């Protein structure tokens, strides 16, 4: 079983909407999926209550001591993908989820405040040496601001671009909000729309990344954890460096 954790310091970045979209895209692709909610705000639970459909099941876990054991039980029960939605900030529960992740996705809108706020989440992810990627979310349909934000997030090493910033960027369209209000994922609400296709492509990107990490692990290759532009491998002994070029997003 693979575990994807969506985490970020700042609220309003679209973690829950992305979690729902990725879960349904993975289900469409044949996975047995479980959505796990660790955010007391209850966005996923409220979505499921509007949905009236059992799958994918949403589980709430607010106790830090339950996460690892529950993930192990889900794997034994045949679940192939767990998608964990977390509260804003880095609480003890969020830290536990990150510790169990195979891949951490850090959503960020293409704004200076979102990009700056991602540093705290990135520090927690690095502390556990977890593979991660930023997801540029709620972006304008077009414009230089998007690419500038992507370059600010990935740092100065162009070789890291494909791993540090997920593709495609997720554009801001009404389909996401309308789908959520209807208890649906965007791929169900408007299956032939551009938003649905972006989410499917994002899932394919994430799945390819997960499979690549698994292959590296099995072959005892160099660690797949990719750290941004020159940051030391051990986050506990080296000072974290700020993500560069914030003003490029303005």
List each model region and its residues.
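Walker A/P-loop
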Residues: 16
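Inter-motif core of Ras-like GTPase G domains
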Residues: 91-112
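P-loop/Walker-type NTP enzyme "switch/lid" segment
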Residues: 3-9, 13, 21-96, 179-182
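Structural beta-sheet core signal
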Residues: 35, 84, 106, 134-136
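Anionic-ligand binding region
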Residues: 113-163
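Inter-lobe coupling/hinge region of RecA-like P-loop helicase motors
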Residues: 177-203
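P-loop NTP-binding site
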Residues: 216-250
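Beta-strand-loop-alpha "switch" segments that mediate conformational coupling across diverse proteins
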Residues: 140, 150-187
């Amino acid at each position: 079983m693979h575990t994807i954790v969506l985490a970020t310091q700042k609220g309003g970045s679209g973690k829950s909407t992305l979690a729902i979209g990725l879960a349904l895209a993975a289900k469409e692709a044949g996975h047995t999926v479980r959505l796990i909610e660790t955010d007391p705000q209850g966005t996923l639970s409220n979505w499921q209550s509007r949905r009236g459909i059992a799958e994918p099941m949403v589980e709430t876990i607010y106790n830090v001591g339950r996460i690892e054991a529950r993930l192990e039980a889900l794997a034994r029960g045949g679940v192939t993908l767990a998608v964990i939605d977390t509260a804003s900030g880095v609480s003890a529960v969020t830290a536990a989820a990150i510790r169990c992740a195979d891949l951490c996705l850090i959503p960020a809108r293409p704004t200076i405040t979102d990009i700056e706020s991602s540093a705290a989440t990135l520090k927690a992810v690095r502390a556990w040496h977890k593979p991660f990627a930023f997801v540029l979310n709620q972006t304008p349909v077009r414009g230089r601001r998007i690419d500038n934000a992507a370059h600010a997030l990935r740092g100065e090493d162009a070789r890291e671009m494909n791993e540090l910033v997920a593709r495609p960027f997720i554009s801001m369209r009404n389909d996401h909000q309308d789908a959520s209000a209807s208890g649906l994922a965007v791929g169900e609400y408007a299956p032939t729309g551009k938003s649905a296709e972006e989410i499917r492509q994002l899932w394919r990107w994430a799945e390819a990344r997960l499979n690549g990490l698994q292959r590296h692990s099995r072959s005892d290759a160099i660690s797949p954890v990719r750290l941004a532009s020159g940051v030391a491998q051990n986050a506990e002994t080296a000072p974290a460096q700020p993500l560069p070029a914030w003003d490029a997003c303005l």
